[in-house]
Amino acid sequence: MSEIHLDDLDRNILRLLKKDARLTISELSEQLKKPESTIHFRIKKLQERGVIERYTIILGEQLKPKHLALIVLEVGKPVIEDFLERYISYISSTLSALPGVLFVAKSGEDKIIALVGKNNKDELVKFIEENITSIPNLKHIQIFPITEIKKGEDLTGFLAEV
């Protein structure tokens, strides 16, 4: 994939749309002091080049999970090492299907990172006990309750399910 070059106008359009994707071309034009045709053309080009993939929403506070935990799972190596990748894939897809699991990623060859969110602390603890700590063949589990988000507070509103 070739490197994407953005000029100041492209960056300003993206910055405004990231803040509020509901802005109309007319409103963008007014804020950026550029003709509507220019804004329309630039947005079309940004979409064609894959810079803008889609427009989405961020759920409000009422629908965001109130209690979050970042969980790091270290998977024990199976007797047949070739099965490690398949087992990690299986755990990842199983976790991804569970309600309240907002994010799942692989780290290194034997770790899985998951972000879990629930509406109350007891529900979160119960979920972790029933669904995470019960996974067989885990070498180590680290649970990091998130007490305060310093940057990226919209992330849970983006990832949360309805």
UniProtKB/Swiss-Prot annotation:
| Occurrences of domain HTH asnC-type (ranges) | 6-78
**CDD domains in the record:** HTH_ARSR
Keywords attached to this entry: DNA-binding, Transcription, Transcription regulation
- Answer whether the UniProt record assigns the keyword Transferase to this protein: no
Q: Does the keyword DNA-binding apply?
A: yes
**Which SMART domains does this one have?**
HTH_ASNC (SM00344)
- As annotated, the DNA-binding region falls at 25-44
Among the GO molecular function terms of this UniProt record, one is: sequence-specific DNA binding
* A Pfam family this chain is assigned to: AsnC_trans_reg_3
Give start-end ranges for the coiled-coil region(s). Answer: none
Listed InterPro entries: ArsR-like_HTH, AsnC-type_HTH_dom, HTH-Siroheme_Decarb, PF0864-like_C, Tscrpt_reg_AsnC-like, WH-like_DNA-bd_sf, WH_DNA-bd_sf
- PROSITE patterns (alphabetical): HTH_ASNC_2
What PANTHER family does the record tag this protein with? Answer: HTH-TYPE TRANSCRIPTIONAL REGULATOR PTR2 (PTHR43413:SF7), TRANSCRIPTIONAL REGULATOR, ASNC FAMILY (PTHR43413)
| Name of the protein in question | Uncharacterized HTH-type transcriptional regulator PF0864
